[in-house]
């Protein structure tokens, strides 16, 4: 029985595995970033088009990657007479 090990650090393997999974997800996203943004843009347009008419040229999708966080910015210009309910 380890007397001094009782108060020591817990196993860090699960934490390291989780960090590695997050890192790999970010790396995979950055490798296919342009493809991912294009796919997301088309899917967003398709979902919005189910409810209102929107010009596909008025939909902008942008992905930024920082050291600690990645952001996805979506800008959709919806006309006042869109044929749907106002938000």
Swiss-Prot record:
Pfam families: MinE (PF03776). SUPFAM superfamilies: Cell division protein MinE topological specificity domain (SSF55229). Signal peptide: none annotated. The keyword Cell division applies. Gene3D superfamilies: Cell division topological specificity factor MinE. GO terms for biological process: cell division; regulation of division septum assembly. Keywords: Cell cycle, Cell division. The keyword Cell cycle applies. HAMAP family: MinE. NCBIfam families: minE, PRK00296.1. Belongs to the MinE family. This is Cell division topological specificity factor. It comes from Chelativorans sp. (strain BNC1).
